[in-house]
Curated annotation (Swiss-Prot):
It comes from Oenococcus oeni (strain ATCC BAA-331 / PSU-1). Coiled coil: none annotated. It is an enzyme of class 2 (transferase). GO terms for molecular function: 16S rRNA (adenine(1518)-N(6)/adenine(1519)-N(6))-dimethyltransferase activity; RNA binding. CDD domains: AdoMet_MTases. InterPro entries: KsgA/Erm (IPR001737), rRNA_Ade_diMease-like_C (IPR023165), rRNA_Ade_Mease_Trfase_CS (IPR020596), rRNA_Ade_methylase_Trfase_N (IPR020598), rRNA_adenine_dimethylase (IPR011530), SAM-dependent_MTases_sf (IPR029063). This is Ribosomal RNA small subunit methyltransferase A. Its EC number is 2.1.1.182. The keyword Methyltransferase applies.
């Protein structure tokens, strides 16, 4: 194993692609990571250790899988592209702690991980499906310690964005509701083969300690979505679009916003998650809608 270049090295990646006449699938958003420093940064950033079971999403030809296998107790790699399975079986043959599963992660049975005490998720996701996969994982039964993901740089900025910034919005609040977000490392497009049209970033999500769901979660996210429907409009006007424009609704909305402690000209981007939770409570108490 030591005499063979790492799978993620440019020379080994080219050799594998040529040997199997393999071309990156645009339909599946495939780009192969060929920067060993970045691969090792992912493993180190995820703090993978000998007690960890790792779920990897989208192993490709096994570049990241190989580095994970060297550090983890077990790696279960989910690959949706059937033609990559025999390649993965060959490139990862030396690593007996790797299991390759040909399945869409959105259809995976996570019950097999119920007894894992130290579960971590690592992924180099196609950009077009990053957000759906993240929400699927966050809403799943998986008791993970962290999710470490390579994603488009702009999406990473939106996930981490703080109140009042240009990137802050519905996605920021929806993700930060359940987890803490940290950008570990920016990654240039030159680290991939073929090079994508955008730069990337490695992001880590960790569950909030003592997380308790808001009792009226569905109402909360409906209000958040409505509040960012027209970013340049005030919160009052956005909520009027949502509830319906009439004098009674305006009075109740304005009262609810005032009771939250804000000026009536405030925009949705100025409210924190805690502010939105209080706003939902106030809107309900003012009987503009039911939280149930």
């Amino acid at each position: 194993m030591n005499d063979i270049p790492a799978i993620g090295s440019p020379i080994r990646t080219r050799t594998i692609l040529n040997e199997y006449d393999l071309h990156a699938s645009k339909r599946l958003g495939q780009n192969f990571l060929i920067d060993l420093n970045v691969l090792q940064e992912i493993v180190q950033g995820a703090a993978i250790g000998p007690d960890d079971t790792v779920i990897e999403i989208g192993p490709g030809i096994g570049s990241l899988t190989e580095q994970l296998a060297k550090a983890a107790k077990q790696v279960v790699a989910y690959e949706i592209d059937k033609k990559l399975i025999p390649i993965l079986s060959e490139t990862l043959r030396p690593y007996k702690n790797v299991e390759i599963v040909n399945r869409d992660i959105l259809k995976a049975d996570f019950s097999i991980f119920a007894k894992n005490q130290s579960l971590k998720i690592v992924a180099n996701l196609p950009y077009y499906i990053t957000t759906p996969i993240l929400f699927y994982l966050l809403n799943s039964s998986l008791n993970f310690k962290s999710v470490t993901v390579m994603m488009q740089k702009e999406v990473a900025a939106r996930l981490q964005a703080g109140v009042g910034s240009k990137d802050y919005g519905e996605l920021s609040l929806a993700i930060q509701y359940r987890v803490n977000v940290e950008i570990i490392l920016p990654v240039t497009r030159k680290s991939f083969m073929p090079s994508p049209n955008v730069d990337s970033a490695i992001v880590q999500l960790t569950p909030k300690e003592n997380f308790q769901s808001f009792p009226h979660e569905e109402a909360l996210f409906k209000i958040i979505k409505a509040s960012f429907a027209h970013r340049r409009k005030s919160l009052v006007n956005n909520l009027l679009y949502y509830f319906g424009k009439n004098d009674e609704n305006r009075t109740k909305i304005e009262r609810s916003i005032s009771e939250t402690g804000f000026d009536l000209n405030i925009r949705g981007e100025r409210l924190t998650l805690e502010n939105y939770e209080q706003l939902v409570n106030n809107l309900s108490e003012n009987m503009i809608f039911s939280k149930e």
